[in-house]
Amino acid sequence: MAQLVEHNLAKVGVAGSSPVVRSKRNSPTTTVAGLFLYLSPRLEPERGRAFWVVAVALFAANVRFGRIIVGISHNLVAREIRPMATEKSSSRSWMSDAAIYQIYPRSFKDSTGSGLGDIAGITQQMDYLERLGIEAIWLSPFYPSPLVDGGYDVADYCDVDPRLGSLDDFDDMIAAAHARGIKVIVDIVPNHSSSQHPWFKAALAAGPGSPERARYIFRDGRGEHGELPPTNWNANFGGPAWTRVADGQWYLHMFTPEQPDFDWSCPEVHALFCDVLAFWSDRGVDGFRIDVAQGLAKDLDRDDLDRWHLAEGDDMVDDGTHPLWDRNEVHEIYREWRRVFDRYNPPRSAVAEAWVLPERQYLYARPSELGQTFNFEFAKATWTYDDMHTAIEKGLKAAVESDSAST
């Protein structure tokens, strides 16, 4: 699976928004299936040197390059080096060695002159995408959304934002992609919904103790009149992680107040997302990128919650007992999803965006679960030989342990 580092490499001094390097695997044990970097169209000298640090580190990890595709921004220019003879490896998802192009629909191509990119615009550019030599496109969220968080605040998981088109437009886009041998990946956001989702509106209207409220994480406050939040946590995007509603209860939001967290102990939440995955799979979607994959299962009934931090990556433990992140129970969810994926021929693929300790990455990438996970050690590593070498080695180790491909 080509590494899709999204916006994270911007934090370490690399700007831009498109896949740059792809390497094709040669064997299960000496593999870097692909590395997606985000480079500025005009590389400054130090950033150019950083590129070669990556290349040297890859070779140092005993990786033999196969085909390499290099591209810059949306105006991606492809070049191909013929692959070397490769050993036959174990069967894995097509994602394992695909060149994947991320599209943010609202900025990619405007087909109507509205000033906003849309689904039909992607269809219009399908010949261009085919010429690049890519094998799949990954669409950032295109669902109805208030856009508090770039579309990751979803108000309806089974529709297209009317500003971007319709389900008919989506079907046309899928057909155009498949006609050219291009697969389609979409984002799924299962940790939270938009506060404008019908379920959350129903939860606010129904009141404490209702089945509607059980779909989200509502708690009574502390203090004599419940005026204090249930815990002392701050959200990942800043500010308190709890918001109080009119009847006095508080709801949890790991990111923004407009993104209330689902309660995954509720069977209705499980059923909703199995239906969502089937809905898009039935329409021809080939794969799913799972947002905040490590954050679904939570334990808020323990007595020591105030000593933990909500921010991703803080206080991480290696035994799956953190109350908020990377809990062992999350893997029951993904085994359930794998049963949905495997109903299709070919089975649908998935990749986890899971910010977890390197030694636990492989759990998400097991064939019985999502099958792939991003190796964010690349995003966190400094642009030095030692750091990149270590990140690659950790990724290869996780790949061997999970019978998946390194990302």
Identify the meaning behind each predicted range.
Residues 354-407:
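Noncatalytic carbohydrate-binding groove/subsite architecture in carbohydrate-active enzymes
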Residues 7:
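Extended, structured, electrostatic nucleic-acid-contact surfaces
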Residues 16, 337-341, 395, 399:
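Hydrophobic, Leu/Ile/Phe/Ala-enriched alpha-helical segments that form helix-helix packing faces
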Residues 137, 288-290:
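Hydrophobic residues within beta-strands of alpha/beta enzymes
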Residues 85-278, 282, 295-358:
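Acidic/aromatic-lined carbohydrate-recognition and catalytic surfaces
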Residues 3, 16, 24-27, 34-35, ...:
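Short, positively charged low-complexity motifs
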